[in-house]
Amino acid sequence: MWAYADLCNRLFQAVNQASQFKDLKIYYFHNCFYDQLFTAPQCKWEDKVSTEWVLHNLKPEYKVIVVGDATMGPAELLEPGGTLDYDHENDKAGIDWIKTLKKRFTSAVWLNPLHEKLWDYDASTRTIQIIREQFPMFPLTVQGLEAAIKELRKGEA
């Protein structure tokens, strides 16, 4: 995902400047989010913020856009302790954090920088399929972002 950090930053800054969002908050993670998110793309521990804090301090009405390729080792997504950060043990599986976020923020989508043709490619993209069961997934393109925003605005007056 590091290859897409600059693209994501430019894309969301442009959206923010176009007044698409009243309040834009950006958090980062590597592969999957667990009990910590980060306020800088390098995902250093000095830039961490508790995922629980985010869940409890942002209103449920927030629109959430998750950006990631959704590819990782299945253990990273499905097992407690699956994080690749050997200095930190996650007690809750990544999929459980994903479900918790989706339950808290019902208007949530996932933008994926991988070409859509690769989403159903083979067993190595199994994690994409699992995440797609939780979030509507769109390509990380201008058209994908437009479709994602349309999805987020469903049900608005």
What residue ranges belong to the model's regions?
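Von Willebrand factor type A / integrin I
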Residues: P60, A70, P74-A157
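An amphipathic, basic-hydrophobic helix/alpha-beta surface used to engage anionic
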Residues: M1-F21
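Short amphipathic alpha-helical segments and helix-helix/interface helices
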Residues: F12, N16, V54, G94-K99
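Von Willebrand factor
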Residues: D23-I65, T71-L77, I95
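A generic membrane alpha-helix/interface feature
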Residues: Q17, P41-C43, D87, I130
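A generic structural motif
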Residues: S19-L24, R104-S107
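A short acidic (Asp/Glu
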Residues: Y4-N9, D35-A40, A75-E79, W119-S124
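Short, basic, helix/turn surface patches
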Residues: W2-A3, V54, F138-Q143
